[in-house]
UniProtKB/Swiss-Prot annotation:
Function: Represses transcription by RNA polymerase II. Represses genes responsible for initiating filamentous growth and this repression is lifted under inducing environmental conditions.
Top-rank taxon: Eukaryota
Disulfides per UniProt: none
Ranges for region Disordered: 90-128
UniProtKB keywords: Repeat, Repressor, Transcription, Transcription regulation, WD repeat
Protein known as: Transcriptional repressor TUP1
Length: 511
């Protein structure tokens, strides 16, 4: 009996030793794997730091290049002014010489008239009749000059006084009027559908993807209206913003909603404001379900990705951020040299465009964060914007970007999509007499609409660059313009938000 117990004990000891050996082996393996993981983490952090350093170096080089370029431009301008001064001096000397020659000729003629026979009186001049025919060449953009940054403003946009406008090329209503380009037939008709009064300046307007609703942003309040009826269906106010008087509160106590954007399914609404916060609202309950924190200055622009899971934001803190709404975390931060005023996501979600105070439109890969294009005056034609870019919008096919600037122009950029070719400015739209504050493209890529501080909205023919008409429908700056995505070829809906505390919904009809 005792020998059998000894055998069991030996067997148990062997099993325990085997288990100990396995445990030691597993511990060593785990330690090895942990060490490998730590090595990988260390390498990843090192590479990420190197990538950030490279990116910062590139930004520093861009800034240095811009300063050098501006210095060269100033020197060129100085030399040009010197040449102009010399030309004027030479011209004045030549004119004085001509005047002396003319005086000598007149003296000779007077001497001849003393002895010459009386001349036959000249025939009366033929009366000149004023032509009522309009010279259309003054109103049409020369195809060879489409992309030029400097062009003449068409005459019908020079004087916006409706009383002086040709009756054949205007439409006048009690609350608005339309001026038409005389070089084209009046194919487009504009009518106001709804006028929506607000208690303060309307900073932004945005349609839902299905075109059934429109959201507006003003002081402390976001409102959602039914597009068909004009009925107010939601009034969104974050009451906690009044209670939490912290660093996010503005000195004046105001809290302007700078940007609004519907999610693709229309269930959520994102709002960006002066308090550096992005609020995500559930429209069915009219409650905030998420607050995204991270920006250090005002939020000026928002746009959803097509999948609805991500949101891009632009801020005065010189950054563009991509947010993962599933985690409420920022997944990517893109930093630039100056404040970001506007952002847009391409229709396929692969690209992000942003306009900035530094006169540049940047385009990034939305996945990697790599800078794909920089659209500015550094292009080979030197026809980029000459002042801050306040609005960008992708065309419906994603191949072009429209941009509006404080230099009073709208530009259309063609995206090459190839590393060996740079994107170019295809068209420069000239016609506004003050800052361009907002731009948008119609779904069929036929028209570009722009709103300006000159209180007007211009319909541009996207391909030719010709202004077709100007709508004067507000008593203050047109801060925001948006087009409904369900607009068709022959008719469409667009909206405007203004400093006159009104948002208006309009309809265009193509005859």
């Amino acid at each position: 009996m005792y020998p059998q117990r000894t055998q069991h004990q030996q067997r148990l000891t062997e099993l325990l030793d085997a288990i100990k050996t396995e445990f030691d082996y597993a511990s060593n393996e785990a330690s090895s794997f942990k060490k490998v993981q730590e090595d990988y983490d260390s390498k990843y952090q090192q590479q990420a730091a190197e990538m950030q350093q490279i990116r910062q170096t590139v930004y520093d080089l861009e800034l240095a290049h811009r300063k050098i370029k501006e210095a060269y431009e100033e020197e060129i301008l100085r030399l040009k002014n010197e040449l102009d001064t010399r030309d004027r001096q030479m011209k004045n000397g030549f004119q004085q010489q001509q005047q002396q020659q003319q005086q000598q000729q007149q003296q000779q003629q007077q001497q001849q008239q003393i002895v010459a026979p009386p001349a036959v009186p000249p025939a009366p001049p033929t009366p000149v009749t004023s032509l009522s025919v309009i010279d259309k060449s003054q109103y049409i953009v020369n195809p060879t000059q489409r992309a030029n940054h400097v062009k003449e403003i068409p005459p019908f946009l020079q004087d916006l006084d409706i009383a002086k406008a040709n009756p054949e090329f205007k439409k006048q209503h009690l609350e608005y009027y339309v001026l038409y380009n005389p070089a084209f037939s009046k194919d487009l008709d504009i009518d106001m559908v709804h006028s929506l009064d607000h208690s303060s300046v309307v900073c932004c307007v945005r349609f839902s993807r299905d075109g059934k609703f429109i959201a507006t942003g003003c002081n402390k309040t976001t409102q959602v209206f039914n597009v068909t009826t004009g009925e107010l269906v939601a009034k969104l106010i974050d009451e906690s913003s009044n209670e939490n008087k912290d660093d996010n509160t503005t000195a004046s106590g105001d809290l302007y909603i700078r940007s609004v954007c519907f999610s693709p399914d229309g269930k959520l609404l994102a709002t960006g404001a002066e308090d550096k916060l992005i609020r995500i609202w559930d429209l069915s309950t009219k409650r905030i379900i998420k607050i995204l924190r991270g920006h250090e200055q005002d939020i000026y622009s928002l746009d959803f990705f097509p999948d609805g899971d991500r949101l891009v934001s632009g801020s005065g803190d010189r950054s563009v951020r991509i947010w993962d709404l599933r985690t409420s975390q920022c997944s990517l931060t893109l930093s630039i040299e100056d404040g970001v005023t506007t952002v847009a996501v391409s229709p396929d979600g692969k690209l992000i465009a942003a306009g900035s105070l530094d006169r540049t439109v940047r385009v990034w890969d939305s996945t990697t964060g790599f800078l794909v294009e920089r659209l500015d005056s550094g292009n080979e034609n030197g026809n980029g914007h000459e002042d801050s870019v306040y609005s960008v919008a992708f065309s419906n096919n994603g191949e072009q970007i429209a941009s509006g600037s404080l230099d009073r122009t709208v530009k259309l950029w063609h995206l090459e999509g190839k590393s060996d070719k740079k994107s170019t400015c295809e068209v420069t739209y000239i016609g506004h007499k003050d800052f361009v504050l907002s731009v948008c493209c119609t779904p069929d890529n036929e028209y570009i609409l722009s709103g300006s501080k000159d209180r007007g909205v211009i319909f541009w023919d996207q391909a030719s660059g010709n202004p077709l008409l100007m709508l004067q429908g507000h008593r203050n700056s047109v801060i925001s313009v948006a087009v409904s995505l369900n607009s068709k070829g022959t008719e469409g809906i667009f909206a405007t938000g203004s400093g006159d505390c009104k948002a208006r919904i309009w309809k265009w009809t193509k005859k």
